[in-house]
Amino acid sequence: MPRRRSVEPRKILPDPKFGSELLAKFINVLMVDGKKSTAESIIYGALETLAQRTGKEALEAFEAALENVRPTVEVKSRRVGGSTYQVPVEVRPSRRNALAMRWIVEAARKRGDKSMALRLANELSDAADNKGTAVKKREDVHRMAEANKAFAHFRW
């Protein structure tokens, strides 16, 4: 960590099709071994399927799905006097997006559908309907924070 000033985050170029920075970040999360064009084709295919299924615009449906997966609180381990407590802390906005994207991609990869585009489309439509593995993950994180609310005074 720098001592003088905090480092400003790098600017990310918006994606070529929709012009969304959020979608560009999602493409980068999905990308494996630097194959960005493959990741883009998977995501654009999934968004097309999602738009047909929901009847909304693709980007609108994507953002709705992401909103349902974003966590507001999480637990962090804190060692106090020889014992470790799970302390609930609020999640900063950039981390909310990062976690939501990561959870959606992980859930899509674990699905058993035919292609990755179809798996991603199914996971995004489930997330938009407030169900699915990614939403369950968010609920679990919130449940953990709720269960450990008694240790909130250990926050740092």
Swiss-Prot record:
Keyword line: Ribonucleoprotein, Ribosomal protein, RNA-binding, rRNA-binding, tRNA-binding
Entry's Gene Ontology BP terms: translation
Pfam families for this protein: Ribosomal_S7
SUPFAM superfamilies hit by this protein: Ribosomal protein S7 (SSF47973)
GO molecular function: rRNA binding; structural constituent of ribosome; tRNA binding
CC terms in the record's Gene Ontology section: small ribosomal subunit
InterPro entries, sorted: Ribosomal_uS7, Ribosomal_uS7_bac/org-type, Ribosomal_uS7_CS, Ribosomal_uS7_dom, Ribosomal_uS7_dom_sf
Family named by the database record: Belongs to the universal ribosomal protein uS7 family.
Quaternary assembly: Part of the 30S ribosomal subunit. Contacts proteins S9 and S11.
Function: One of the primary rRNA binding proteins, it binds directly to 16S rRNA where it nucleates assembly of the head domain of the 30S subunit. Is located at the subunit interface close to the decoding center, probably blocks exit of the E-site tRNA.
Name of this chain's protein: Small ribosomal subunit protein uS7
